[in-house]
């Protein structure tokens, strides 16, 4: 039951008690009036006695007249005595008296105490909510700082990985270029050995080596590689630009692999042609030697 309903019920009870007390007061007043009326009733009896004395004083002549006239009906009403019981209001014992002011005061104090309790509970809940909100903000800030630190460490690791990949790529390219240079040198040496045009080609190769032509070619290759190999500057790029840069690098790697495959196939074809030419040269040399011996033997015969 709510406080409003309790207050309404108490108010109705107070009204009923007031009505009851008013009814008791009315009954007491009526009882007092009836008692006063009962004390005033003997006066008609005295009047009746005087009337009887007057009747007795009347002479016998009048009685004779009355006897001659015969009985006459008495039309006057006889006075009737009313019996009114004495109504005494019930008395309330002293121990059962109800003090409505005290009840009202206690009710007001109870309401005030409940209101004070509700206010204190409200402020306690509000204080708890504020503390929880502050702790939640602290946790959010702490988590945000941890994420920023993790992101910074991740970026540093990614940067180091990119640097290692770039260094590894540069090292592989340098080794590949060195290997290609050695292969070309071996091919040139093989070609020079296959060509038996006297010592002209060998001398020319020696003079070229002495003149530093190989060093010049190496420098040219280094220059070309330096032009092709560009610095990887990705610190200022965002996520979309990094994706574009990755696609561009992947495309360049794809092109290099395709070019490498073409060069390998070309190298295989050249190697095959060199072997064919070497076999032909060997066959021709064998044929020329046998012919020379046959001519010499025939001439001596």
UniProtKB/Swiss-Prot annotation:
The record's InterPro entries line, in alphabetical order, gives:
TNNT (IPR027707), Troponin (IPR001978), Troponin_sf (IPR038077)
Spell out the coiled coil positions from the record. none
Residue numbers of Phosphoserine PTMs: 2, 211
Q: Which keywords has UniProt assigned to this entry? A: Acetylation, Muscle protein, Phosphoprotein
In what way is this protein post-translationally modified?
Phosphorylation at Thr-216 by PRKCA induces significant reduction in myofilament calcium sensitivity and actomyosin ATPase activity.
| Basic and acidic residues biased stretches | 125-186, 206-224
List N-acetylserine occurrences by residue: 2
Provide one Gene Ontology biological process annotation: atrial cardiac muscle tissue morphogenesis
Phosphothreonine found at: 207, 216, 297
Q: Which Pfam families match?
A: Troponin (PF00992)
- MF term (GO), any: troponin C binding
Q: Where is the composition biased (Acidic residues)?
A: 1-72
Q: Where is this region: Disordered?
A: 1-97, 125-224
The GO cellular component terms are: cardiac Troponin complex; myofibril; sarcomere; sarcoplasm; striated muscle thin filament; troponin complex
Instruction: Give the function comment from the record.
Output: Troponin T is the tropomyosin-binding subunit of troponin, the thin filament regulatory complex which confers calcium-sensitivity to striated muscle actomyosin ATPase activity.
Q: Which family does it belong to?
A: Belongs to the troponin T family.
Q: What is this protein called?
A: Troponin T, cardiac muscle
Provenance organism: Mus musculus
